[in-house]
Design a protein with these regions (language model features):
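Residues on the lipid-exposed face of transmembrane beta-strands in outer-membrane beta-barrel proteins
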Residues: 1, 55-61, 71, 102-106, ...
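C-terminal beta-signal and adjacent terminal beta-strands/loops
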Residues: 119-143, 159-163, 170-239
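Flexible, solvent-exposed coil segments and beta strand-coil junctions
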Residues: 31-40, 76-85, 141-150, 210-216
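Outer-membrane beta-barrel translocator domains and adjoining extracellular loop/strand segments
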Residues: 20-26, 33, 76, 80-88, ...
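Gram-negative outer-membrane beta-barrel transporters
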Residues: 12-15, 34-128
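Repeated loop/turn-to-beta-strand initiation elements of outer-membrane beta-barrel proteins
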Residues: 4-7, 66-69, 111-114, 175-179
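Residues that define the transmembrane beta-barrel architecture of outer-membrane proteins
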Residues: 1-3, 49-53, 96-100, 160-164, ...
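Membrane-embedded beta-barrel scaffold of Gram-negative outer-membrane proteins
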Residues: 1-40
Length: 239
């Protein structure tokens, strides 16, 4: 539209073929992400297929009256075919769908600059735990951890996450060098990323008089949140 304002749009499509498929639960390893213990001696074959596609829109404003910014929105789908006979595509662990980023700086008088970066990430899919199976004493003792309910693989979705970072710079131009000082505050809103809750074994058996194959541990839910406000200051010298 002008010399300082630019827009662009890009689409993409990628097809995956002959990816490892678990013979234990008939789920493609590539769709499990990093939380499912996909490394090891699990039996697999190369029959999984998938796809990733989407659209990215970008706007750039170049140094007009001291303001520069880049904003982008991405819609992305990442899916693999269900290997359990349905033939339907199911979301992979990377299927966040909506991604928005904005970063901008504004030049103030007397060599001051202020900048901001905003990120909004859509919630990733996840697989619920099979709490009923996990609470069985024999099942928990066999694995030492929770079991996923693969019949509901990636059927739930985490909440979106938003993070705002702020930075203020001051530059001093001296005779023989340039001195820059800055204050940077990451996650100034102190946003918390809500992860999938887990359950821990308390050690208490709820029904100790029942047959061993029916005994259950008491499991306690534990909420998981990450993210903290992180301020920092710094100096930069250029000769």
């Amino acid at each position: 539209p002008s010399s300082y304002l630019k827009f662009s749009a890009e689409g993409f499509y990628k097809k995956y073929d002959q990816y490892p498929m678990s013979l234990v639960d008939s789920i493609p390893l590539a769709s499990k992400g990093t939380d499912y213990g996909v490394l090891g001696n699990e039996a697999v074959n190369s029959t999984a297929t998938g796809r990733a596609y989407g659209l990215e829109l970008t706007g750039r404003w170049y140094n007009y009256k001291g303001l520069t910014f880049i904003a982008s929105y991405t819609y992305v789908r990442s899916e693999f075919k269900d290997g359990r006979g349905s033939g339907k595509y199911i979301p992979s662990a990377w299927d966040n769908r909506h991604l928005f980023t904005f970063s901008g700086t504004y030049a103030l008088p007397k060599n001051w600059d202020i900048g901001a970066k905003l990120r909004v990430v859509g919630g990733a899919p996840y697989t619920p735990y099979d709490v009923e199976k996990s609470s069985l004493v024999e099942a928990w003792d066999a694995s030492g951890s929770l079991y996923y309910d693969y019949s509901r693989f990636n059927s739930e979705r985490l909440k979106p996450f938003t993070q705002l970072d702020i930075r203020i710079d001051k530059t001093f131009y001296l005779k023989k060098f340039m001195l820059g000082a800055y204050i940077d505050i990451q996650n100034i809103l102190n946003s918390k990323y809500k992860e999938q809750d887990v359950y821990i074994k308390t050690g208490k058996i709820l029904n100790p008089d029942a047959p061993l194959d029916q005994q259950r541990y008491e499991l306690k839910p534990v909420e998981r949140r990450t993210g903290t406000l992180l301020p920092s200051i710094g100096l930069m010298i250029e000769f």
